[in-house]
């Protein structure tokens, strides 16, 4: 018996079931919802809370490990950026067949689940995350991460300055002026740990543990996602860590 009602409703769904073009790089950006209020409720340390930074970094790593095609992730403040590639070979299948609604809803759910499950703050408060996804040309992948890292540094400078000065004193001040004002108080932003200034980067790194093929005897090394909290400024040089990852995945940089 034909289900005419069900077929009609499914056609409504299909109208908004958009998909990204296959074999094109995808960026997923996940943001904490109202984290300014959340950090107050959980009594996070100002200007930088190492527990929150580590939790966000580990959440990024969890997403990289559980999202098919993800080659790297970048974390700064309450924001996570992921790069997905599904063009490694002709058999590569995109995550959820590149269905946009699935990608944004599940990535936000994964972030929310892991973050709240591993929240060790004394003052508990559930966190929520939203997500967006879009495609970028291969040559603009590095530009995207440069853009987000610049925002990270700008926010880092402002957070440090706000811990020492009132909003009135900081009004219309440039980042360089804020750095100097912090120096006047005895704190040099340039000397802070790199992950306070530039964020954290998650990528696959080759393990030292060998894997031996029982049939051929060939030795290979498994790659695991690691968290790098000592990154420097992203730049257009092959030796830059993000460029190294893109080159390994056959992405054209320039």
Listing of model-derived features with the role each one plays in the protein:
Residues 1-254:
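Regulatory and interdomain segments flanking nucleotide-handling catalytic cores
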């Amino acid at each position: 018996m034909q289900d005419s009602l069900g077929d009609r409703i499914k056609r409504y769904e299909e109208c908004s079931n958009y998909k990204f073009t296959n074999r094109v790089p995808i960026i997923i950006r996940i943001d904490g919802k109202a984290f300014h209020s959340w950090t107050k409720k959980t009594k996070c340390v100002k200007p930088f809370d190492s527990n929150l930074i580590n939790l966000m970094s580990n959440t990024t790593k969890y997403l990289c490990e559980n999202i098919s095609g993800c080659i790297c992730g970048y974390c700064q403040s309450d924001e996570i950026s992921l790069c997905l590639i599904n063009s490694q070979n002709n058999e590569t299948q995109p995550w959820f067949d590149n269905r946009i609604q699935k990608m944004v809803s599940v990535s936000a759910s994964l972030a929310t689940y892991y973050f709240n499950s591993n929240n060790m703050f004394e003052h508990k408060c559930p966190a929520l995350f939203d997500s967006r996804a879009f495609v970028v040309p291969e040559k603009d992948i590095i530009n995207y991460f440069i853009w987000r890292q610049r925002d990270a540094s700008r926010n880092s400078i402002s957070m440090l300055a706000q811990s020492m000065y009132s909003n009135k004193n900081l009004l219309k001040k440039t980042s360089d002026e804020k750095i100097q004002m912090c120096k006047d108080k005895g704190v040099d932003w340039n000397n802070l740990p790199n992950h306070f200034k530039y964020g954290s980067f998650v990528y696959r790194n080759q393990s030292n543990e060998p894997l031996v093929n029982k049939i051929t005897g060939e030795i290979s090394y498994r790659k695991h996602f690691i968290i790098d909290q000592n990154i420097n400024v992203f730049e257009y040089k092959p030796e830059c860590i993000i460029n190294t990852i893109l080159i390994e995945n056959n992405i054209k940089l320039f």
